[in-house]
């Protein structure tokens, strides 16, 4: 299995979710299954069916998280010697050269991406265009509204 790049914070969030699933959700659904079984006939027991379905989801998610964490390559951009260059984990301040809009994005792993928090996936067209570029570079990026030119104003590693 290939490695999955992830920030330290992203790995912490996955570990927190895994802990919650194993120590809160799993015991809760096991209890719900036991209670539904105690009601007798399982062939038409909606509570039992719902609890078993939820159990399947929880177990699947636990396996998925364990797989991701075992393949995770935690990257701390602050520890890299890449001053001024865009790398995984960097926070990049951009200016859209067409309308002057300023944008700030952090480049993160696929599981961490959340545009509402200005976190974009390393596999997104914008991030792929920015990787390895430096402060002051003008970069053509694919955006939903078409190609745009942006200037990299600053690169921070937090």
List PLM regions with ranges:
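Helix-rich terminal scaffold detector
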Residues: 1-59, 63
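Generic alpha-helical hydrophobic packing signal
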Residues: 17, 52-55, 68, 91, ...
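Amphipathic alpha-helical coiled-coil segments
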Residues: 59-73
